[in-house]
Amino acid sequence: MKLRFHTATVRYLLLVCLAGPALSAAAADTVTRCDELAAHPLDPARVAPGQSSGAIDLPQAIARCRVDVAAQPDNARVRYQLGRVLFYAGQFDEAMVAMRRAAEGGHAQAQFVYGIFVIKERPGAPRDPCVAARNWQAASEGGRHAAAVHYATQYLRGTFDACDDLAAAEAIDRWLQAATRAAPPGYAGYYRLLFVDDLRYRLR
């Protein structure tokens, strides 16, 4: 099987590519106060120690992230973090917009979360599983291993059967192998390995 890129995927990836270069590498790597307050522990692009949801001072993080997004509107990482804390605070409409824009800006963690929003039919999310498929495909290529696991799961369930831009089984298997290599030690890693191994078996 070959990886198929059809019109919708080409448009999405082109949008991601065009959105990325607007922010210089130096600016993108600068640690903001928003990073310090709201970085996700599992974000592969985080530049500060991650904060669990329960450890975040939401009013402070929202206020600071708004300031940092205004100062760096093309910084998809910071915009993702604004979307994250807005969602935790129950400000779903604004959170959805921020997450979508961060995903369109090429931020893998935002692409993963936005796909979750779509599949779980969160308020304001499009009711189109193919949107989740495109975002998880991009996030998987960006190193967000959870996106690969979710993609493979929904792919095997037939959720994406109506989509015309699916990844080939070989590509999904490559993402899952990367997830396996990143498995943590201990029971958490053990159960991840079992689950991912089962997904890979079912893809054959």
Q: What annotation goes with each model-predicted range?
A:
Residues 30, 71-75, 104-108, 120-122, ...:
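Short helix-capping/linker turns of helical repeat alpha-solenoids
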Residues 39-42, 87-90, 115-126, 152-163, ...:
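Short coil/turn linking the two alpha-helices of tandem helical-hairpin repeats
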Residues 30-33, 40, 56, 163-204:
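Terminal, low-structured helical/coil segments at or just beyond the last alpha-helical repeat
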Residues 26-69:
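N-terminal leader/linker segments that initiate helical-solenoid repeat arrays
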Residues 61, 95, 132, 168-172:
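Single-residue signature of alpha-solenoid repeat helices
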